[in-house]
Amino acid sequence: MRRNNENRTKSRRQQEQSVDPAALLDFVTPTEFVELPSKGIGYPSGHPLHNQETIEIRFMTAKDEDILTSRSLLKKGLALDRLIDNLLVDKTLKAKDIIVGDRNAIIIAARSSAYGYVYETKVECPNCGNKQKHEFDLSKADIHEPLLGEDIKELDNGNYAVSTPYSKIEVEMRLLTGRDEAVIFKLMNKNKEGDAILSTQMKLYIVSVNGHKQDNVIEHFINNVPAAEARYVRNAYKDLAPTIEIKGDFECESCNHEQELEVPFNTDFFWPDR
């Protein structure tokens, strides 16, 4: 009789252990729709975000926090990509294929839903170098949508074309994505002074020059075009690139210097006190 009782107890324990944990916690991780600064403009036809104004993400969990503390992912600059990939509801999307401004909107939304809109971090005074705590309000985001001037043509492939004012050279440009950010991240790690970042960015977003897509042609244009025309191209890209910024008025406690500061969107954005 005792053996039968032991068998029944063992069987009951095995059944309890085999229960799906998700069934015990009868809820689904909530999701939210994030407004895209690009409004879906700048993505080629066939891209999941082409002409889409929002993107659905789920709320962060403790498992997602583990990604942001992974030393190997942080060292390789892959932590934010992995986090965004995890949060995207549409798994056909990849973080590396999302325009930079839209990625930043996702990062702000994820951080806000996880920890609230108040972002307290240490900032360094640009004038004297003093470090002090400062609060930013994540609910007050400044969104810059793509600005199409009269001299900018939107192409069928999602790219843009602009003609330089003096040489009348037609430059085709595309918007930078997470894939391009990874290239810039590696370059900045190698070159701590940040030299050649502007020219590297131009090499990444310029698709063709007068219809020529060869790398050597694009590099020749960047290295030899008059500075005024290079600046014209960079300003045109700046107008086209959708961005989302979090800024706040800063006053130094040490030297009383006043300046508007902007929040950088990196892994420290989630762990400011780490």
Briefly describe each language-model feature range.
Residues 1-274:
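Long C-terminal interaction/binding lobes of large macromolecular proteins
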